[in-house]
Amino acid sequence: MLVDFWASWCGPCKGEIPNLIELQNKFGGEKFTVLGVNVWDEEEKFKAALTEEGITYPQIYIPRDNKDNATELYGIQGIPQIILFGPDGVIIQRDLRGQAMKDLVEEKMK
């Protein structure tokens, strides 16, 4: 599973969306999925961004005032933060972006 912590106002986050869509389209299924986790955002802007960016992979919206925020659980200080998890739930790598992210997913899906 590739988990992307993002927000609608984050330019670098939006820059990774085409890569995430590409990976979901290529590998999405029983053994792999992209999961977006929208943080530090407003719900209306999050929903609008899904349409504007053409995001079809699963999403979780975490309200700004959520006290049990996943960003704290995973020690996320900035976004985008893209983390690849193995089938056992263990983090394989964090801070993934661009071609390096695509190459790593491709390698792990062989």
Regions found by a protein language model. Give the residues of each.
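Short active-site neighborhood of thiol/selenol oxidoreductases, capturing the structured segment around
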Residues: 1-11, 20
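Conserved hydrophobic/aromatic "anchor" residues
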Residues: 5-6, 32, 49, 57, ...
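Thiol-based oxidoreductase modules, predominantly thioredoxin-like and allied folds used
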Residues: 29-45, 55-66
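Short, contiguous acidic/charged loop-to-helix segments that flank catalytic cores in large enzymes
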Residues: 8-12, 25, 37-41, 61-62, ...
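Catalytic cores of extracellular degradative/oxidative enzymes
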Residues: 8-11, 47, 80
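Conserved helix-turn-beta segment immediately C-terminal to the redox Cys motif
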Residues: 15-37, 51-52, 103-110
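Thiol/disulfide oxidoreductase modules built on the thioredoxin-like
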Residues: 15, 51-56, 62-108
